[in-house]
From Swiss-Prot:
Domain notes: The N-terminal half of the protein contains two conserved domains I and II. Domain I includes a slightly degenerated ERF-associated amphiphilic repression (EAR) motif which seems to be involved in the activity of transcriptional repression. Domain II is required for the correct degradation of the protein through the SCF-mediated ubiquitin-proteasome pathway. Interactions between Aux/IAA proteins and auxin response factors (ARFs) occur through their C-terminal dimerization domains III and IV.
Ranges annotated as biased composition (Polar residues): 55-70
Organism: Arabidopsis thaliana (Mouse-ear cress)
Name of this protein: Auxin-responsive protein IAA12
Record's subunit section: Homodimers and heterodimers. Interacts with the auxin response factor ARF5. Interacts (via domain I) with TPL (via the LisH domain).
Top-rank taxon, per record: Eukaryota
Keywords: Auxin signaling pathway, Nucleus, Repressor, Transcription, Transcription regulation
Recorded family membership: Belongs to the Aux/IAA family.
């Protein structure tokens, strides 16, 4: 009986001891539990807070360099964009200068051409040409010739190269100026006088010629005694 009573007494004392321990644990560990259940703030981590504040202040104080900025798509550095714009501007300026030089050269060339074909400078342009024995006259552009020889060649091809005429048999090529043909080349000046072609300088001739005529030497003998004398000397002194 004694053993049973001690066991019962021991069992009855267990809840009281456990409650005592639980109460002591809550009373002793209450402060620690409150600390563990509280929400942490930046004040609990002073080192981290100072680091973030330092980084934010550094980012706000120093702005990135302008050369690192990107423009457009695909991204292009601002300094490269500026260089491209400057290059384009320089190319445009050079192109304008080149166009200006070309225009100046072209204007000079046009002036030269106008001086060459200007009738006031280089004669009257087209003049009428007649030949004895040929009823149809022709016209020749005086501005297209640079010498008496060129003019004589053109006229000989016009008239003596025609088929069905007797003149082709009488006149040899390039004989209108040397006095060895039965025909000579004459012209009428602005004053209405007939003269032999070749007695005056070429520029004076083209500025004064009004029309041309290929006439026989018999009719032209009174126009150019010098040419007739030259012809007589050639006959007397054959080469």
């Amino acid at each position: 009986m004694r053993g049973v009573s001690e066991l019962e007494v021991g069992k009855s004392n267990l809840p009281a001891e456990s409650e005592l321990e639980l109460g002591l644990g809550l009373s002793l560990g209450g402060g620690a539990w409150k600390e563990r259940g509280r929400i942490l703030t930046a004040k609990d981590f002073p080192s981290v807070g100072s680091k973030r504040s330092a980084e934010s202040s550094s980012h706000q104080g120093a702005s990135p360099p302008r050369s690192s900025q990107v423009v457009g798509w695909p991204p292009i550095g601002l300094h490269r964009m500026n260089s491209l714009v400057n290059n384009q501007a320089m190319k445009a300026a050079r192109a304008e200068e080149g166009d200006g030089e070309k225009k100046v050269v072209k204007n000079d060339e046009l002036k030269d051409v106008s001086m060459k074909v200007n009738p006031k400078v280089q004669g009257l342009g087209f003049v009428k040409v007649n030949m004895d024995g040929v009823g149809i006259g022709r016209k020749v552009d005086m501005r297209a010739h640079s010498s008496y020889e060129n003019l004589a060649q053109t006229l000989e091809e016009m008239f003596f190269g025609m088929t069905g005429t007797t003149c082709r048999e009488k006149v040899k090529p390039l004989r209108l100026l040397d006095g060895s043909s039965d025909f000579v080349l004459t012209y009428e000046d602005k004053e209405g006088d007939w003269m032999l072609v070749g007695d005056v300088p070429w520029r004076m001739f083209i500025n004064s010629v009004k029309r041309l005529r290929i006439m026989g030497t018999s009719e032209a003998s009174g126009l150019a005694p010098r040419r007739q004398e030259q012809k007589d000397r050639q006959r007397n002194n054959p080469v």
